[in-house]
UniProtKB/Swiss-Prot annotation:
Binds to DNA non-specifically. Could be a regulatory factor involved in maltose metabolism. Belongs to the SfsA family. Pfam families: SfsA, SfsA_N. This is Sugar fermentation stimulation protein A. Disulfide bonds: none annotated. Keywords: DNA-binding. Residues 201-220 bind DNA. It comes from the Bacteria. One of its GO terms (molecular function) is DNA binding.
Length: 234
């Protein structure tokens, strides 16, 4: 994924009201950005960090600038736009960069499924193969080289795991993909210290046939690409 037009650089002043952030540009202008991330963003929003933002061509938007990446003062890149996790995963599947998800010729997005009336991020289909249901999660919480999900209690994430267990029980392929969007992370675990129920459900889901995968994105202010498998400890 190439950023076109190129991202612009600023310095973070503060994030507030979850969806807003104030930054100062190199010429001293103060801007308010849209922050497309409802999570705690622990370690991703420290005042003084470098922010890379995109600008919408839609002149009717109240906040036309969107926070895409954080470049921390230690040099790590973090993609804070949670929408990018799905886009990167879709691109990687279509370009056959994820061998575990190769061999399908149809990809559908936002398909309704499950007893709790959810929408799956992606469904893959091919002749003579079970349908493959994929839920994608964005991983940005880092403690040293360890990456964790979630960064706050997620009842929605718990629901998705229950739904995937139902998919597996019905004979389909069920997959959760953790998209690691922090350059300092080298391994992944569920965040038991934040949401013990989610961690327990993830282990249960794996035991009941749900595949748990994690891939890391190469991140820069110019482009992003999801391709590197990451070790998982449940």
């Amino acid at each position: 994924m190439l950023f076109s037009p190129p991202l612009q650089r600023a310095t973070l002043i503060q994030r507030y009201k979850r969806f807003l952030a104030d930054v100062i540009t190199p010429d001293g202008t103060t801007l308010t950005l849209h922050c497309p991330n409802t999570g705690a963003m622990t370690g991703c929003a420290t005042p003084g960090d470098t922010v890379w933002y995109s600008t919408s061509e839609n002149t009717k938007r109240k906040y036309p600038h969107t926070w895409e990446l954080t470049e921390t003062q230690s040099g790590a890149f973090i993609c804070v736009n949670t929408l990018r996790a799905n886009q990167l995963t879709k691109e990687a599947i279509q370009e056959n960069r994820l061998p575990a998800l190769a061999g399908y010729n149809i990809l559908k997005s936002e398909v309704k499924y499950g007893a709790e009336r959810s929408r799956i991020d992606f469904m893959l289909q091919a002749d003579f193969r079970p349908d493959c249901y994929i839920e994608v999660k964005s991983v940005t919480l880092a403690e040293k080289e360890n990456g964790y999900f979630p960064d706050a209690i997620t009842e929605r994430g718990q629901k998705h795991l229950r739904e995937l267990m139902g998919v597996a029980a019905a004979g389909h392929r069920a997959v959760v993909v953790f998209a690691v969007l922090h350059s300092a992370i080298t391994r992944f675990s569920p965040a038991r210290h934040i949401d013990i129920k989610y961690a327990q459900l993830l282990s249960e889901a794996q035991n009941k046939g749900v595949e748990v995968l994690a891939y890391k994105a190469e991140l820069s202010a110019q482009k992003m690409e999801l391709n590197e498998p990451v070790p998982i400890t449940l």
